[in-house]
Amino acid sequence: MQTKPFRIGTRGSPLALAQAYETRSRLMAAHGLPEEMFEIVVLSTKGDRITDRALSEIGGKGLFTEELENQLLSGELDIAVHSSKDMPTVLPEGLHLSAFLPREDMRDAFIGRTAPKLLELPQGAVVGSASLRRQALIRRLRPDLNVIVFRGLVDTRLRKLEEGQADATLLAFAGLKRLGKDNVPTEILDPKEFPPAPAQGAIGVESRIGDARMDKLLAPINDRPTYDAVTCERAFLAALDGSCRTPIAGYATCEGDNLHFSGLILTPDGQTSHGVEISGNRRDALILGKKAGEEVRAKAGSNFFEGWS
C-alpha cells in the first residue's frame, strides 16, 4: 500500500501549476485518494529563466523539460506534467508520455488591441508572438504586418499588449481557458486557416518506462482519443525532425474508430507552404502521422528545409 505521497513534477508558471492541479484532481477522483497523497513539486527550467529570446535561438523545446526529466530518471519524481506541445519528439532513454488528459480546445486565440480580428488589423500593425509557426501563419495571411518576438508568461504577454508594445498577440486558447481567461480573446482562429501546433491543448504525463506502479496509477485518467490524436501529431513532427526551430502545424481529430490528420509546413516568411491530409483507423495513429510527415517532406523537396535550423 502506498504510504508516501506521489510526487508530481511541474514548472512553476500559473499555467503549468493549473495543469498539475488538474492532473492531481483527476487522479484523486479516479482512485478515491485524498489530496495529501499527492505532492506538487515545482522546478524552475532553463526555458522559464531565459525570457528575452526566442526558443529557436536558445535550444528549442527541451529547455522546458530537462530539469523535470532528470528528477524523473533519478526517482525524485514519480511523474511529470507537461504541455504536450512543449515536448521534444525524442524523449530521454527510459521515459515516455504514458497518459494524456482529455484535450482542451486546440485552437489559437487572437487578442487584438487595435482591431478585434487578425484580418482587420491596419496595414503595418505590430503582432507579437514567440512561436515560429504563428509568425509564419501570420505572414502567410497578412504579409504586410510587422511580426515581433513576444515571450514570457501569459500575464506578461497580455501586459506587454496593454502597454502598447504590440497591436495584437496570439496565444493557445486552451491555456487561456485553464487560467480562467476565456473572455480575453477577441477572435478564435479557425484551424483550417490557422492550424495549431501538434499536441496543442493536450496535457501530457511523463513517467518511467517499466514503472508498473505509475502505469496503474495513470491508466484511468488516460483519454484514449487524445492519446491517439497526439500520437499521430507527434509522429508527424518526428518525421519532419520538428522542434521550435521549424514552422510546423498539424492536428488530428478522432471520430469513432477513425482518425483524420491535417498537416502543414511553411517557410518562416509564410510565403511557401505544403499541406497534407490523411485518414485511417485510430489504431494506426503512429503510422499515419509518420506517413503524413514523409509525404509532405517528399512534396516539399530537400531544398525547402535548408536554412531552417
Curated annotation (Swiss-Prot):
S-(dipyrrolylmethanemethyl)cysteine: modified positions: 244
GO molecular function: hydroxymethylbilane synthase activity
Cofactor note: Binds 1 dipyrromethane group covalently.
GO aspect biological process, one term: protoporphyrinogen IX biosynthetic process
Cofactor(s) required for function per UniProt: dipyrromethane
Enzyme class: transferase
Enzyme Commission designation: 2.5.1.61
Pathway: Porphyrin-containing compound metabolism; protoporphyrin-IX biosynthesis; coproporphyrinogen-III from 5-aminolevulinate: step 2/4
Reactions accelerated catalytically: 4 porphobilinogen + H2O = hydroxymethylbilane + 4 NH4(+)
GO cellular component: cytoplasm
Alphabetized InterPro entries for the sequence: HemC, Porphobilin_deaminase_cofac_BS, Porphobilin_deaminase_N, Porphobilinogen_deaminase_C, Porphobilinogen_deaminase_C_sf
Keywords: Porphyrin biosynthesis, Transferase
Protein role: Tetrapolymerization of the monopyrrole PBG into the hydroxymethylbilane pre-uroporphyrinogen in several discrete steps.
More about this protein: The porphobilinogen subunits are added to the dipyrromethane group.
Record's subunit section: Monomer.
Family from the record: Belongs to the HMBS family.
Name recorded for this polypeptide: Porphobilinogen deaminase
Source organism of this protein record: Agrobacterium fabrum (strain C58 / ATCC 33970)
